[in-house]
């Protein structure tokens, strides 16, 4: 699901330099994509309320957006989820 606009900004703190996944370029790339795709305001998608900070996507679309393989995306999503950076919920 695309946000209503592709304008605006996200706040990224310098402390990110010390983040445990900062030195893994593919995980960092996926995390930044997630930050940029997150909804700024609540919205609805196919009758489901999507909260602020959440977004709807698929592994296939993340592969297309990042150039990573399905296995790479799944591995990095699992890492980000295990470390508490993201949560994954089926709609």
Report each predicted region and the residues it spans.
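Winged helix-turn-helix DNA-binding recognition segment
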Residues: 3, 20-21, 38-91
């Amino acid at each position: 699901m695309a946000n209503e606009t592709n304008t605006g900004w996200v706040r990224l703190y310098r402390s990110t330099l010390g983040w445990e996944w900062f030195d893994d370029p593919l995980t960092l790339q996926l995390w930044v994509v997630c930050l940029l795709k997150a909804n700024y305001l609540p919205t609805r998608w196919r009758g489901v309320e999507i909260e602020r900070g959440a977004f709807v996507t698929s592994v296939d679309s993340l592969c297309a957006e990042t150039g990573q393989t399905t296995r790479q995306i799944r591995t990095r999503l699992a890492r980000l989820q295990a470390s508490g950076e993201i949560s994954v919920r089926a709609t």
